[in-house]
Amino acid sequence: MMVSMRDMLNAGVHFGHQTRYWNPKMKPFIFGSKNKVHIINLEKTMTMFNFALFELKKISLRKGKILFVGTKQSASKIIKESAILCKQFYVNHRWLGGMLTNWKTVRQSIKRLKDLESQSQDGTFNKLTKKEVLLRMRELSKLENSLGGIKEMGSLPDALFVVDADHEHIAIREANNLGISVFSIVDTNSDPDGVDFIIPGNDDAIRAVNLYLNAVSKVIKKNVKNEK
């Protein structure tokens, strides 16, 4: 699955942020500016994205776990859909501090989530008062929202695929602390430090986000299929 220059142009991948919001560390990936908006060098993006896809393919071939991270509203839905499509994992609402670095505690919360799911299906809730049922349903909903995308992960992931490096800086820092590879879309306002596989590109436009995630999920899904 190769991504072409035409695909990226059509999706608006080259449009960065307003020049006044730029991060100077992104200078090597900027082509120029137009109407006070930075234009990203798509030749570099194409090379770096296709290399990232190649590396993600290698991880999935060895049955590695890839965690998709995109908690801002514009990315939330497609992050979940893409991860499910290629049988991987996701965090698409709030990133809970310690989600990776405090995995032992997170595992206990996942166990609680699974216990509540069982209780809601095995008749346990029928034996409780309405108030107790309501409290447990609220807890279940909250846990599902936060941990639903990682409840079957079982252990720490081998890599993170992040849509917005600036917005998800806590997740990136945690991955760095644990030596987990980070693949990320990095816009002109973001700090690329801590990202192992930088993909310079627009991280706001829905069409651009769709392009990235469609390519990534297809590469991984193909390998997951080939294992069967």
Swiss-Prot record:
NCBIfam families reported for this sequence: rpsB_bact (TIGR01011)
GO biological process, one term: translation
InterPro entries: Ribosomal_uS2, Ribosomal_uS2_bac/mit/plastid, Ribosomal_uS2_CS, Ribosomal_uS2_flav_dom_sf
Family indicated by similarity: Belongs to the universal ribosomal protein uS2 family.
GO molecular function (one): structural constituent of ribosome
Identification of the protein by name: Small ribosomal subunit protein uS2
Keyword line: Ribonucleoprotein, Ribosomal protein
Gene, per the UniProt record: rpsB
HAMAP family xrefs: Ribosomal_uS2_B (MF_00291_B)
Superkingdom field: Bacteria
Any single GO CC term annotated in Swiss-Prot or TrEMBL for this entry: cytosolic small ribosomal subunit
